[in-house]
Structures are given as structure tokens and as C-alpha cells.
């Protein structure tokens, strides 16, 4: 079973993560992921979560926008052997997702990419 950490910014995209999150979590579960959720409540939380707990997981996923992704990556850069990164873009601009051609504000499609 794949250990997946999902760091969720509930303020990203005006809280749009709620739409489809349950379906995405069900898909991840059926795909063999044991998912643990971490919710941010302020600036820097995603960095600290990733740095403190990231090494305990096979994949660290980010549910949020460009800022949340940046924080997660900053935290993972502190680790000697960082895990793989998954991204469920749910921000307002999602510039990173646009550049990489990732589905935006579509939790289920993004969850499928994490499984692959």
C-alpha cells in the first residue's frame, strides 16, 4: 500500500477543494493509497508539515495553489531523500499547473495522475 500525505490548503481557490475531494480520496483508496490528510491554517504550515512528516510517506501531495505547492516543495527540500510529489491544483491562478499541462480544479483527474 502506498503511503500518501495530502497537505490541503482549505483557503485556496475559495475553498473549492471540497468539490470532488471525497471522490478523489475514494479513487486514491481504491488505487492502493493509504492517505493521511494535513490541513494548513496559515502561512508556513505546508512547509513545516512537509519537512516534519514528509519522510514518512511514499508520496507527498499538495491540494492548493501555486503558493501551497511552493511551500510543500520548500519543506521537502529539507529532506535528505524526499518522496515523490503529487499535485492537485485548486488555487486561483494555478500558473504551475498551466505550465505543466495539469488538470486544474479537477480533483478526480489530478488524483488519477497521482496514481500513475
For each feature predicted by the language model, list its residue ranges:
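Small-residue-rich beta-alpha loop regions that form the catalytic core of phosphotransfer
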Residues: 2-116
Amino acid at each position: 500500500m502506498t503511503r500518501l500525505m495530502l497537505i490541503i490548503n482549505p483557503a485556496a481557490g475559495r475553498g473549492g477543494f471540497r468539490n470532488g475531494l471525497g471522490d478523489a480520496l475514494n479513487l486514491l483508496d481504491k488505487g492502493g493509497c493509504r492517505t493521511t490528510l494535513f490541513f494548513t491554517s496559515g502561512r508556513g504550515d505546508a512547509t513545516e508539515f512537509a519537512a516534519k512528516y514528509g519522510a514518512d510517506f511514499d508520496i507527498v501531495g499538495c491540494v492548493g495553489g501555486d503558493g501551497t505547492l511552493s511551500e510543500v516543495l520548500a519543506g521537502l527540500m529539507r529532506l535528505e531523500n524526499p518522496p515523490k510529489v503529487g499535485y492537485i491544483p485548486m488555487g486561483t491562478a494555478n500558473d504551475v499547473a498551466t505550465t505543466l499541462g495539469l488538470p486544474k480544479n479537477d480533483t478526480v483527474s489530478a488524483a488519477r495522475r497521482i496514481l500513475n
